[in-house]
Amino acid sequence: MKWRRDARDKRHFIIMSAVAALVLVIGLFFDQNGEQAVETSGTQTVTVREGAVTDAAVMAAPISESAVQAAATPSPEDGIYTYLQGPKSWKERREWSGKWGKTFYDGQSFGAFGCGFCCMANIYSSLTEYQCLPTDIYRYAKKVTYYPGGGAISWEQMQATLNSIGFETSLHHKPSTYKQFLKQVQEGRASLVLVSSANDSSYWKNTPGHYVTLFLYDKTDNTVFLADSGDPEHNRHRVSCKTIYKALKTSSDYHFMSIDSYNKEKDQWKHKGIKGNWVH
């Protein structure tokens, strides 16, 4: 009968409308790529793909044991000291800066001449069981060498100071080839080098002469971990040895020093503890 057919048509229309509405809701629920963003506890967001929604999919992926161990293992770079010398770094309270940056010693600002002392403090604190500040080794150098204070320290004075605290060192001129320089850097436990923008200005700008320290040579890419007390943007970065080689200041008596070894028995200082106002 006609009224029964009309009723069937009405039910069919209602069912089809409900199906269409359900499809629309599902389409809004999933994004265009068939993915759903599911918020989990904490700050993680897990992406779930349509058709593959499982209990595992809506949970954050577990962290592997090896990943946990890798995160817990400190990097060799973490144990390297890299002091900053200047007043600007101290004013900004940069990590590795200290009050010495704005202080005058023997009539001169430490920030103007302290790079050599930062280098020696880096070496002593990084390669031995002892620690010191740049100003500690500044005072020590005045006691054990003829360094008068209040200015840049010479190669010979730095070598005498380092020898007094247990290090075997060797002074070098710039080798004629980059390959020779790499070999000397690789053989040392660290290197103390003098760079100048007069020799190459690709990395150091407006730098007549500046001592920096090189640690942790990596033979896979021929880079070193740079301790640059004069520039926070250079400090604690890996730098190509080729960059260092090109910038070696050749108008100096010597161009770099290799830190060959350390003997605790020959360390006449054994400085324990760091006392001072600095950021770390």
Which residue ranges define each predicted feature?
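Active-site-adjacent structural segments surrounding the nucleophilic cysteine of cysteine proteases
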Residues: R4, R8-P148, K270, V279
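Extracytoplasmic/secreted envelope proteins and their assembly/folding machinery
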Residues: G116-Y124, P134, Y138, W155, ...
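Mid-length scaffold segments of soluble, non-membrane domains
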Residues: C132, R139-P175
